[in-house]
Each structure stands twice: as C-alpha cells, then as structure tokens.
C-alpha cells in the first residue's frame, strides 16, 4: 500500500510543479543538477486510516524537500503545492490537503548554493487495497 501511495504522491507533485523540476523518491538527489528538485522519502510517508474503516481513504503525512539554485524558483514550487484546490473531478487520488509546516534547511557548505525548504503536508489520499 505504501508503494501505491508513493506513486500517487509522486505523480501528483510532478503534475503540479511541471517541467523543469525533478521529482525524486527515496533518495537525496545529485546537487550538481542545475534544475530545481523536489524529493520525498518513502520512509517519511506515514499513512493512517481515516475513521471510516471501510473507506480506502488514508491520511498521509509527507515531508517534501524543495531545493533550487534560485530562491524564487524554490518559493514558486512551495506556492504551487500550497495553492491546490480539490473538487469531485480530481482524479489524482489526493482528496484534500492540509499545511503542517514549512522551514528552511541547513546544508553543508558544499551544497549551500541551493535554497532548500522542507514542507510538511497532510494529504487525504485514496488508496485501493
């Protein structure tokens, strides 16, 4: 079930951030890349079932790292992730989103030319068991 959730979350992020931004799962990207990156680790996806035990909806708490050589690009990715609206026609598998936290990350001097933030979101995700 976690693997399906990871795929759903990855495709949702890719659709939102569009081209020019790389989306990674399960590993820290190569910081030599010249483009913006978004990554989340499978270990950081925590699923909890909603109160309705017959439902396929779960809550997924996801920590997403956004990095870019350009602060404006990093901020634009954060904004696009936070500005999502959801309706009945949504086919992404993500039914609702709640913002939990956003903070800047400190990296070692070898990669400090990247602007990086960690965004924590709580997603209501439809997982077919």
What name fits each language-model region?
Residues 1-52, 72, 88-92:
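Small/polar-rich, solvent-exposed N-terminal microdomains that initiate assembly or binding
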Residues 49-57, 109-114:
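Short, solvent-exposed beta-strand/turn "edge" segments of beta-rich domains on protein surfaces
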Residues 67-87:
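Mid-chain, well-packed structural core segment of small domains
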Residues 9, 13, 23, 38-40, ...:
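Hydrophobic beta-strand residues in large extracellular and virion-surface proteins
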